[in-house]
Each structure stands twice: as C-alpha cells, then as structure tokens.
C-alpha cells in the first residue's frame, strides 16, 4: 500500500505540474519560458517539504512539459529537469526549515538554466556577465513564485492539516 501511495502521489504531482504549466502557457503564451519566468506550477515544489514523492513527480512533470513544448530549448529537457531534481531533493532535506528551503529552486534553476540561456542567447558567446544576468533573471522569477504562491500553498497545507491528510 505504501509503495502504491508513493507512485500515485508522484504521478498526480507530475501531472499537476505538466497540466498547470501547459495551462499557463495557453493563457499567456510563452510566459513559461521567458528569462524572468513566473511559472506558477513551480509553486508545487513546496510539496517536496511534505513527501518524497514530489521529487520524481516534479522532475518527470518538468521533463514531460519541456519535451512537449515546442518553444523549449534543445537542452532544456535535461538541464531544467535536472535543476528541478536538485531543487526538490534539497528541499526535501531541508523540510524542517521551510523558508530557506523555498530558495532552492531559485538557486539551482538560476545557475543551471541561467547557464543554458547564456549558451543559447549570449551575443558574444559565454561571458560571466551574461551568465550572471541570466542566472539572476531566472532566480528572480523562481523566488517570486516560491515566496508568494509556494508559501501560500505551504501555509494552507500545514494550517488546515491537508498535508497530513494527503501524505500521512
């Protein structure tokens, strides 16, 4: 039963990430791939504070979205998904410290996706200045989502007991 719950939770979390990201991209075209992304589905990263199933769920949801979105950069399915994996893994390890844990997606996506964007869009090739700017822009979007929508989701799930009812 425990393994079934884990797989079910991971699948539902991945499907929610995939569907929310596509919905946002449908409603506001390309908003999920701007330099300063406000990818609302990233708020689901807070689920890593409640269940280890969020790690494969969010990683696979991100991977499937990046593979299915024609506007995604060629390496994004690997780089973006790996950043999500590292962020969620770190958040799970930091679950007793939720406020600093919320910064992990900004840290890993800022560095890895910032590097990727600099490779593709750096006008003079890869420079540290261009990388720093790209990393900062990606991190700003992540921080905005996690410390608004993510924190709201976290507080709602803890204060209402929803996290305990869903994840045990």
Residues of each region from the PLM?
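Membrane-embedded alpha-helical hairpins and interfacial helices in multi-pass inner-membrane proteins
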Residues: 25-34, 63-168
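Small-polar-interrupted transmembrane alpha-helices in polytopic inner-membrane proteins
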Residues: 16-17, 21, 58-66
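Hydrophobic transmembrane alpha-helices
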Residues: 1-49, 53
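Membrane-helix interface "capping/anchor" motifs
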Residues: 47-58, 92-102
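A generic alpha-helix surface/boundary motif
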Residues: 38-42, 58, 84, 110
């Amino acid at each position: 039963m425990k393994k079934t719950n884990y797989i079910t939770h991971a699948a539902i979390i991945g499907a929610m990430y995939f569907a929310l990201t596509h919905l946002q991209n449908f409603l506001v075209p390309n908003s999920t791939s701007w330099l300063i992304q406000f990818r609302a589905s990233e708020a689901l990263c807070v689920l890593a504070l409640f269940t280890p199933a969020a790690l494969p769920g969010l990683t696979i949801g991100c991977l499937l979205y990046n593979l299915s979105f024609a506007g995604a950069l060629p390496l994004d399915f690997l780089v973006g998904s790996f950043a999500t994996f590292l962020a969620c893994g770190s958040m799970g390890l930091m679950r007793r410290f939720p406020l600093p844990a919320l910064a992990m997606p900004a840290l890993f996506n800022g560095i890895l996706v910032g590097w990727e964007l600099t490779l593709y869009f750096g006008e003079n090739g890869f420079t540290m200045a261009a990388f720093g700017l790209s990393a900062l822009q990606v991190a700003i979007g992540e921080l905005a989502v996690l410390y608004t929508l993510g924190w709201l989701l976290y507080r709602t799930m803890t204060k209402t007991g929803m996290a305990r009812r869903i994840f045990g």
